[in-house]
Amino acid sequence: MNCKKIEKVSLWQGIIIWAALVLLFFAPAVFGGKVLAPVDCVECLFKPFATQPMEEVHNQYNVDGASQYLPYSWAMQQSWQSDGYMGWNPYTHNGTSLPENTMLSPGDWHHWLFGFLPFWTAWDAGILLQFFIAGLGMIILLKSRGIPIPYVLLGAVSFSFYSQFIMWI
């Protein structure tokens, strides 16, 4: 391969390629009518919500997503819809303030999506954008070091789709 051609790929072209790669990776779930949430855990593992007999759960390591992040995010979306701001969670104790819930990270940027998007659209967009932003940071870092875009994209994929990162998003 001609190294001169590789070096002529611009940063913006690399970012567009990265956006296409992230969208392509998530396309089967997003365009297939699925959600990027561990709802199989809820349907099989959690009583009294288990609506079907126990079967093999695809990824039991991300149970926090179903037991904590989904309900917290649902409460936040309901608060945005009813109050117009991130306010009160009526589902815990006798009600608690959403900004006090540090596990939820209520000031995190992706929670603001719940204010103007439907719940599952905001949830999926938040996850896609987290992967995109992680890779974008790596692209900018590696490109600032003078590394050609194909290798920069390899670095973005390696960082963004690192197993520990995937498991906790």
Named regions from a protein language model:
Residues 2-16:
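N-terminal membrane topogenic signal
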Residues 8, 18-21, 101:
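Generic N-terminal initiation segments characterized by hydrophobic and/or small/turn-forming residues
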Residues 12-16, 125, 152-157:
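Hydrophobic alpha-helical transmembrane segments
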Residues 13-28:
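Hydrophobic alpha-helical transmembrane signal-anchor segments
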Residues 24-138, 157-169:
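Membrane-interface coil-to-helix junctions
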Residues 139-161:
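Transmembrane-helix signature of polytopic, membrane-embedded enzymes
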